[in-house]
Every structure is written in C-alpha cells, then in structure tokens.
From Swiss-Prot:
<dbReference type="GO" id="GO:0031982">
    <property type="term" value="C:vesicle"/>
</dbReference>
<dbReference type="GO" id="GO:0051592">
    <property type="term" value="P:response to calcium ion"/>
</dbReference>
<keyword id="KW-0445">Lipid transport</keyword>
<dbReference type="GO" id="GO:0051649">
    <property type="term" value="P:establishment of localization in cell"/>
</dbReference>
<dbReference type="InterPro" id="IPR015816">
    <property type="entry name" value="Vitellinogen_b-sht_N"/>
</dbReference>
<protein>
    <recommendedName>
        <fullName>Microsomal triglyceride transfer protein large subunit</fullName>
    </recommendedName>
</protein>
<dbReference type="GO" id="GO:0005319">
    <property type="term" value="F:lipid transporter activity"/>
</dbReference>
<dbReference type="GO" id="GO:0044877">
    <property type="term" value="F:protein-containing complex binding"/>
</dbReference>
<dbReference type="GO" id="GO:1902388">
    <property type="term" value="F:ceramide 1-phosphate transfer activity"/>
</dbReference>
<dbReference type="GO" id="GO:0005548">
    <property type="term" value="F:phospholipid transporter activity"/>
</dbReference>
<dbReference type="GO" id="GO:0043235">
    <property type="term" value="C:receptor complex"/>
</dbReference>
<feature type="signal peptide">
    <location>
        <begin position="1"/>
        <end position="21"/>
    </location>
</feature>
<comment type="subunit">
    <text>Heterodimer; heterodimerizes with the protein disulfide isomerase (P4HB/PDI). Interacts with APOB. Interacts with PRAP1.</text>
</comment>
<dbReference type="GO" id="GO:0005783">
    <property type="term" value="C:endoplasmic reticulum"/>
</dbReference>
<keyword id="KW-1015">Disulfide bond</keyword>
<dbReference type="GO" id="GO:0042953">
    <property type="term" value="P:lipoprotein transport"/>
</dbReference>
<dbReference type="GO" id="GO:0031528">
    <property type="term" value="C:microvillus membrane"/>
</dbReference>
C-alpha cells in the first residue's frame, strides 16, 4: 500500500518545514521514480454495433515519472518529467488472428523509427495548483507524436475539490466540473464548450443537418486518501437527422495506473522554473498543450486531372439519373477542396460542353477560395455562349451549404457589371437574396456584403430603376425574407398590378408566423375582401392562405367562412376545400375554424355545398415518430374551366425543423378568349400567359415562361412538340458536414457527411382546342446519395468507417381538364415511382505502410411505387375522365 500511496501523493508534506500550503492537485514525492502503465485505445462503429464488430487500435506503453523541481515557497508549484517507454501497438479488443494488420510487425516498423524516437523523448510538465501551466517538449517533433504526448500530459491535470472551472488541455479551453467523493474524483469535461481552432462546417437547416453528442469523463481513483489510477473515456456519436441509419460512434479510452516505485534522481535546485529547465536541457521549448492540427498526407493518390478523367463518363448527361453519378460528384468535390486554382481552371478550360455543366456544379459546390476564383475566371457573364453554365453556377451558389461573405461579394460585383442575358442578371439578384438569408441564419447579418445586399434589394423595391425590375427584387426578397421588407411587400400586395400583387403575397407566405402581425393581417384581409380595389383570384386566395396559416383570430376565420358562397364559382370551391383540408389535416387553424363553425350563420348547407373543380389536399408521403414528409396540391381554375394556378409542395419535418423541399407552381391567365368564354371579375384585361415557378430546398429559382402574349401562344400551339420545359436540372450538394475532432487521447478524428442529388424538374402544359382538353405535367426525377466517412488517425495507423445510402426516385403530377361541359371534368394524378434503396458499410484498419484490414456489408430493398391519394371527389372524377377499359376477349356478338 505504501508503494501505491506515493503516486500523485495527495498529502500535507512533512519533509520540509518551509512548505507554506498544501497540494490542491496531484503531487509527487521527491527522489522517487514512479513506474506506471499507460494505454489509449479507440473504437469505431455505426452507432449501435457491438464492441467485437468495431474497428480500432490500442497504443500501450510504460511511463516513468519523476519530480525534478518543487518551488521552495510552496509545494503546489512543481516540475515533473514524463518519459514514455516500451511502446506497443495492437488491435483494440478485436481478435483478428491472421487478419490483424499488426501481426508480425515490430513497433519500429509500425510507428516508424523517427516517430518512435520522438515518442520516447521525455516531456516536462510545470504543474501549478494541480493544473498544467506549461508543457515542454523538443522542437520540430511530428505533430501526431506531440499530440499523443499531450493526451498523456492532460491526465496529470486535476483538483481535489468539487466545483466548476475552465481548464486548458489538449481539447482546448474547456469548462470542466469536478465531483469529489471519498474514493474518487470525477472530472466531467463539457466538450461542446471547448475553444480550439479546427476546420469544419455544417448545413444550417436542421432537417439536413447532423445531431452529435460528445461526452468526456475522467475518473481519478483514490485508495486510503491517495490517487492510484486514472481512467478516462470520451465518446463522440452522430446521426444524420434526415436518415438516422447514417450514424457513427467513436469511443476513446485512456488508462494510467501505478505499478511500482523505486529510488529516483535528486531534485534540481533553483527558485525559478525557467532556470531549472535550462539546466536540465536548453533544447526544451514551451509549446501549447492544446492539440495541434495533424495534416493527413495522401500517398499515391491521383491528381485532380486524373481523378476527373476516371469519373467523367458517370457525369455525362445520359448517366445523371444514376446514383453512381452523384457518388462521383461528391468524391470529386472532396478532391476539389484540396486543389489549387490553376489545377481547377485547367480542367474547366479543357472540358467539352456536354459535361461542362456538371463540372461547374462540382467546382461551385466545393466552396473554397480557389474554386471560386477558378469558376469566376472561367465564366464570362458578358457572353451569351455560356448562358447554361452561368445559370448552373448561380443555382449551385444558391444551394451552397456554407456560403461565405466572399461569395456574396463576388455576386454583388457581378450584378454591377453588364450581362449578355437579362435572365442571368435576374438570377444573380435572386441568388443574392438566398445567400443573404443563409448568412443571416449563421449570424452574419452585420457583414459588410450582407448589409450592402440588403440595401440593394430594399432600395430596388422602394425606387426601382426599371418597372420590370420589381419582379426581380421581389423574388430576391422571397429568398432573403428580410423583416424590414414587409412594409414594402404590403404596399405591392395591396396596390400593385395583378402579377406583382400576387408575387408580393406569395413572398409574405414564406415568412415565419412571428412576422405576420395583426397589422399585416389587416392588409391581407382588405385584399381578400376587396375593400379598396378588385384583385385577381390568385391574389385573394393567397392572402387568405397567409391569414389562415398564421394564428388567425376568430373574426378573421368567421369573415373568410362567411365569404364562401359570395365568391366567383371556382373560388368558392377552392376556399371551401382549403378549409376542409385544414380540418382534415388538423392544421393549427383547425381549432379556431371548429369554434367558428359552431355558429349556425356560418355552418349551413348552402355555403358548404358549392360545386366546382378547384381543390386543395394535403397528405403524408412518409411518417415516423421523429419525422414526417408531406405533400400538398391545390388547383385553382377560372370560371371557364381553364387552369389558373396549380401548386404542388413537398415539405420535410424533423421535430420542429422544417425544409421546403420543393414547390412547383404552374400559372396561366388570359386564355378565356381561346374558347370564347367570359373572364372572371377583375381578370378581364389580362394578357395571355403561362409559366412555371419553383422553390427547391428553400431557394426560390427564376421562373420560366411557357408563353407570353397571344401571338406567342398561337405560335407555340402551332409548333408544339409536347416536350417538357426544364425548370431546374443539375447536381446539388445538399448535405455537407465536416468536422475535425481533437480527441483527448491525442488522436485525430475526422467526420465528413455529404449528401448530393442529381435532379431534373420539368413541366409542360398542353392545350387542345379540338378536344377541348388541357393537360399539365410536373415531373420530378432524382438520384440521391448520402455518404459518411469517419476516421481516427495517429499518423502511423488509421481506423475508418465509411457508409453510403443511395436511391433513385421519381414523382409525377398530371392534371387533365376536359372543358367541353360545365362543370368541367378534372382528374389529378400523383404517381410515386418505385425506388430501390441500397446501403453500404465499410470498416477498415490501415497502417501508414499500406497494410490493411477491411470489412464490408451491404443491404438492398425496394420501396414500391404508388399513386398518392387525393380527395374522394378527384377519384370519382378520374373514373369519368379515364373510364375503366372493358376486358379484352370475344363478346360473341361480332361479325366474325
């Protein structure tokens, strides 16, 4: 017991009458050599795996500790020397047998001669009141080796009393809590408070983000009032919010235990620690105890050009619907992030036009200074020969996972220049709005470029230089969602012309409920009830939708319900189905609507039996205890049976977080003249127009036009091929999480999760006067790949866990209208194609010399396709529009 007691002796020293205080942390006796054993081990698995299924490794050694100096004025100030000896590297808990990467390998072969020599060099710790004041080592030692030493040194830092304080150790400047008990002291480190410089980023939207949990507990065991051993465990776990099967866990353990003591060297005399260290060895230098960045070197990896050539075929247009295209896209982004501007630019200039759009997607998505410089050097916005590339660049900017001020500043500079295409100019401003919102979400609202962009958007709406620019600035505000823009939106919504008024109300529709105040709802009520001027149906119905979505009052709901029956025919039916959908789907406003419906004047048969074909419906695509995916479809027709607006939305919810996955709106107006019909009130003088607008992953894109004006309509009808118009097509980096983690053992961990998709959203509108039928189609096709890569690296041995999930899916919406009679026949169909789901997992252990162990697993399933249900009236109507075909076979009544 005496031998154990002298380790980290926690006692009132009796060897010197000059001691003025007592130890508050670990203390050693003089002229003793402490022989300890030390081990650090790490395990990686998929989050719920068993220990034997994990990968990892164990580094063990002997440790010699001696007290070199103690301050004559107090025993709480001491200098100790720590020397690592007898290093061994092996598997951590797993029995690999012949498959072990360490079998037959000596420690010098595994660790490396230079690394091992550096690891064995003694380090010095200056302890003051139990905390490491300075960490001394030799200059120019390998970073990975220094970090292993720091991991051991941090265990010597403790206090004997309970309390919360801040400590600096290998993890950084962290908040720690001590819990002192009779037989142990427990130190809990709050890893989320640690301040340490490490690269990393994540996606702002929580639906696409990563939930992580980190814990660190160090236990100092005490026997008979003396510390005898130190046991530490750190856990890092993560899961992708959107797909929780993409998960991982790192467990890092340390153990330091006394074995024996023997006679040691005399203490070095001196009053100042600096002089003592110089006397011991002048080559010692004070270095930070905080872990330093270990740069991973890729040996034998292909160059950027070689990598591009190996994946190029997967990114050809005809292959983009395959998951392999997205996998190649994600891997190439990782390579681009470590590449120089010149390398990137060289590939851009050498590529052919068929694959260039996909290359532009990847380069822009890399989001590094080098990739931004390269793409801006490559694109010429004054040339009309690269319009497609310019638009792909802008869309990739809009979807940027972690944009910075430099990207926004670059687009602001471009906007001030000249353009070969006005469409591109509009897209630049719209995407500026998207970047403003993302930067503000990341606490960047006061950045110089953001302030400039906000001023540009709001100024453009207050005093537009050109009337046609109003739409552009409204679309930018629809992305930026600036609270200070709401008064301008109300002005345009109430006093603007039809299309501008409608756009302004749709912008208000995207704001959070906290911004839709009573004043805002007063204006929207005036618009809906037409108190000051006549508005188009699209404007009025959108105003009503905003009111009903944002905590409507009793009178708000009552007045809207009382209006049903007094509206134009199709608007009556539309508003009725909106109310029914709120009740059916139990939306927040449903409670207030049920209260109002208790009044007989509101709830009567005449009001709720209005006929028509307009409709609204919301349903679930997927639903689980922690997440839900919903679709909603609302269609508004004119009184003559021609489509006025169709609106298809998909939302993803995780907890309270929300992602507007997609919205495709097809609008048409001024087409009544084609069938000699009478326009509805307020829509007598509308120009013929049809177009499509899309929101994708919370980003409003530039709308596209099918036709504009009667002459354009007739030429399109005469030359129509029925081919769909593409709204957005390309490769998108959707999930992007990267984290460098300094484990307290000294090992370096990396966590990279990426999700990408190849997407093609197209729409078409067919119109036949001969058959008196119109048909609209919206087609969504996607290939999705999510990858995660976790590694733990010591510089000479690495363990890793790679996982991948992939699928190809499709969703098609078709609306068929036969207007040869009234009420006209409408059939809506939403078809979800079958989707294969493939999951892969690879675990590995690898030496820096190249020898490795690999374990692979895969799982496949097929999610069946289906037709998503809409309301019962629609099903009955579809049976009329597309009557069941009689069974084939001889009827017996034919001529032959």
């Amino acid at each position: 017991m005496i031998l154990l007691a002298v380790l980290f002796l926690c006692f009132f020293s009796s060897y010197s009458a000059s001691v003025k205080g007592h130890t508050t942390g670990l203390s050693l006796n003089n002229e003793r050599l402490y022989k300890l054993t030390y081990s650090t081990e790490v395990f990686l698995d998929g989050g719920k795996g068993k220990l034997q299924d994990s990968v990892g490794y164990r580094i063990s050694s002997d440790v010699d500790v001696v007290l070199l100096w103690r301050n004559p004025d107090g025993d709480d100030d001491q200098l100790i020397q720590v020397t690592i000896t007898a290093v061994n590297v092996e598997n951590a808990g797993q029995q690999r047998g012949e498959k072990s990467i360490f079998k037959g390998k000596s420690t010098p072969k595994i660790v490396g001669k230079d690394n091992l020599e550096a690891l064995r060099r003694p380090m010095l710790l200056h302890l003051v009141r139990g905390k490491v004041k300075e960490f001394y080592s030799y200059e120019n030692e390998p970073v990975g080796i220094e970090n292993l030493k720091r991991g051991l040194a941090s265990l010597f830092q403790m206090q004997l009393t309970s309390g919360t304080t801040n400590e600096v150790d290998i993890s950084g400047d962290c908040k720690v809590t001590y819990q002192a008990q009779q037989d142990k002291v427990v130190k809990i480190k709050a890893l989320d408070t640690c301040k340490i410089e490490r690269s990393g980023f994540t996606t702002a939207n929580q639906v696409l983000g990563v939930t992580s949990k980190a814990t660190s507990v160090t236990t100092y065991k005490i026997e008979d009032s003396f510390v005898t051993a130190v046991v530490a465990e750190e856990t890092r776990a993560f899961a992708l919010n959107f797909l929780q099967t993409v998960a991982g866990k790192i467990v890092s353990k340390q153990k330091l235990e006394l074995k024996t003591t023997e006679a040691g060297p005399r203490m070095v005399p001196g009053k100042q620690v600096a002089g003592v260290i110089k006397a011991i060895d002048s080559k010692y230098k004070a270095i930070p105890i905080v872990g330093q960045v270990l740069q991973s070197v890729c040996k034998g990896c292909p160059s950027l050009a070689e990598h591009w050539q190996s994946i190029r075929k997967h990114l050809e247009p005809e292959n983009l619907s395959n998951a392999e295209a997205v996998q190649s896209f994600l891997a190439f982004i990782q390579h681009l992030r470590t590449s120089r501007r010149e390398e990137i630019l060289q590939i851009l200039k050498a590529e052919k036009k068929e694959v260039l759009p996909q290359l532009v997607d990847a380069v822009t998505s890399a989001q590094t200074p080098a990739s931004l410089e390269a793409i801006l050097d490559f694109l010429d916005f004054k040339s009309d020969s690269s319009i497609i590339l310019q638009e792909r660049f802008l869309y990739a900017c809009g979807f940027a996972s972690h944009p910075d001020e430099e990207l926004l500043q670059a687009l602001l500079s471009k906007f001030k220049g000249s353009f070969a295409s006005n469409d591109i100019r509009e897209s630049v401003m719209i995407i500026i709005g998207a970047l403003v919102r993302k930067l503000c979400q990341n606490e960047g609202c006061k950045l110089k470029a953001v302030v400039e962009a906000k001023k540009l958007i709001l100024g453009g709406l207050e005093k537009p230089e050109k009337k046609e620019d109003t739409t552009m600035y409204l679309l930018a505000l629809k992305n930026a969602l600036l609270p200070e823009g709401i008064p301008l939106l109300l002005k345009y919504a109430e006093a603007g012309e039809g299309p501008v008024s409608h756009l302004a109300t749709t912008v208000l529709q995207r704001y959070d409920a906290s911004f839709i105040t009573d004043e805002v709802k007063k204006t929207l009520n005036r618009i809906y009830h037409q108190n000051r001027k006549v508005h188009e149906k699209t404007v009025r119905t959108t105003a009503a939708a905003v009111i009903l979505k944002n905590n409507p009052s009793y009178m708000d709901v009552k007045n809207i319900l009382l209006s049903i029956g007094e509206l134009p025919k199709e608007m009556n039916k539309y508003m009725l189905t909106i109310v029914q959908d709120i009740l059916h789907f139990e939306m927040p406003a449903s409670k207030m609507i049920r209260r109002v419906l208790k009044e007989m004047i509101v709830h009567n048969y005449d009001r709720f039996s209005k006929s028509g074909s307009s409709s609204a419906y919301t349903g679930y695509v997927e639903r689980s205890p922690h997440a839900a995916s919903t679709y909603s479809l609302d269609i508004l027709y004119s009184g003559s049976g021609i489509l006025r607006r169709s609106n298809l939305n998909i939302f993803q919810y995780i907890g309270k977080a929300e992602l507007h996955g997609s919205q495709v709106v097809i609008e048409a107006q001024g087409l009544e003249g084609l069938i000699a019909a009478t326009p509805d009130e307020g829509e007598e003088n509308l120009d013929s127009y049809a177009g499509m607008s899309a929101i994708l992953f919370d980003v409003q894109l530039r709308p596209v036009t099918f036709f504009n004006g009667y002459s354009d309509l007739m030429s399109k009808m005469l030359s129509a091929s029925g081919d769909p118009v593409s709204v957005v097509k390309g490769l998108i980096l959707l999930i992007d999480h990267s984290q460098d983690i300094q484990l307290q053992s000294g090992l370096k961990a990396n966590m990279d999760i990426q999700g990408g998709l190849a997407i093609d959203i197209s729409g078409s509108m067919e119109f036949s006067l001969w058959y008196r039928e119109s048909k609209t189609r919206v087609k969504n096709r996607v290939a999705v790949v999510i990858t995660s890569d976790i590694t733990v690296d010591s510089s000479f041995v690495k363990a890793g866990l790679e996982s991948r999930a992939e699928t190809e899916a499709g969703l098609e919406f078709i609306s068929t209208v036969q207007f040869s009679q009234y009420p006209f026949l409408v059939c809506m169909q939403m078809d979800k194609a079958e989707a294969p789901l493939r999951q892969f997992e690879t675990k590995y252990e690898r030496l820096s010399t190249g020898r490795g162990y690999v374990s692979r697993r895969r799982k496949e399933s097929l999610v069946p396709g289906c037709e998503l249900p809409l309301h019962q009236e629609n099903s009955e109507m579809c049976n009329v529009v597309f009557p069941p075909q009689p069974e084939s076979g001889n009827s017996g009544g034919g001529w032959f």
